[in-house]
């Protein structure tokens, strides 16, 4: 008993590893697309922990792909330049001046910071934008009216991604995309991650957010819905109980699962090691969406 008390912390750590074993076995060799954004991009400690999670996922046999946003950083730069940020249904209104800032921040700064941190932590990452290798082809999105250089993805060149994965690299993708009209388009990072996951028929699509997941009551943090099948997710989408940036998140999760992604997750990126907790533990921490009803496991 004394011995157990003395090594209590070590035993607890061992139990965590034991709990993770079936998930490591289950997901080894599978592809997981992670949309990285929100507060986890601004807090240096959180940023490091997210990248540690991603490197660990790679080391235990998963194939993580990072698609990143940059909303907070873009907002800060626009504010510094005296340009007002405007949104329609969670999508940034993007005129020509804003598009230049978006591309500069996403591809020139954030993408390279993520790549550098992954490499520092022992991983091997390559950073690209949707324009590189014609990775993400887009056209103007008019579903919310004319909101400028906002695009919707019409094609994903998976050869670029699979080439990196086959060589053991972690792809880090900025969602700025090209159009056949020669223009650059700003594509919502959640949507881009969803389209990439669909094209690859990924095991999982995981969206890091600044909320606990999907709440049945937006004003009650304890009302987290931990699991939803497609029918429930669609009903919730049409209920009017979500707004703002959660709209494209839930929408892209629904489309991803409809188009071959096994599970889509919306999780709180503000929590320490949230990715590992969602993937490798029995309970998970956020909302998981699948095609059909779930058994009592997280697989």
Swiss-Prot record:
It catalyses: N-acetyl-L-glutamate + ATP = N-acetyl-L-glutamyl 5-phosphate + ADP. SUPFAM superfamilies: Carbamate kinase-like. One of its GO terms (cellular component) is cytoplasm. Pathway: Amino-acid biosynthesis; L-arginine biosynthesis; N(2)-acetyl-L-ornithine from L-glutamate: step 2/4. This is Acetylglutamate kinase. InterPro entries: AceGlu_kinase-like_sf, AcgluKinase_fam, ArgB, Asp/Glu/Uridylate_kinase, NAGK-C. Belongs to the acetylglutamate kinase family. ArgB subfamily. Catalyzes the ATP-dependent phosphorylation of N-acetyl-L-glutamate. It is an enzyme of class 2 (transferase). Substrate binds at residues 70-71, 92, 186. It is found in: Cytoplasm. It comes from Thermoanaerobacter sp. (strain X514). Its EC number is 2.7.2.8. GO terms for molecular function: acetylglutamate kinase activity; ATP binding. It holds the Pfam family AA_kinase. One of its GO terms (biological process) is L-arginine biosynthetic process. The record marks 35, 249 as: Transition state stabilizer. Keywords: Amino-acid biosynthesis, Arginine biosynthesis, ATP-binding, Cytoplasm, Kinase, Nucleotide-binding, Transferase. PANTHER family: N-ACETYLGLUTAMATE SYNTHASE, N-ACETYLGLUTAMATE SYNTHASE, MITOCHONDRIAL.
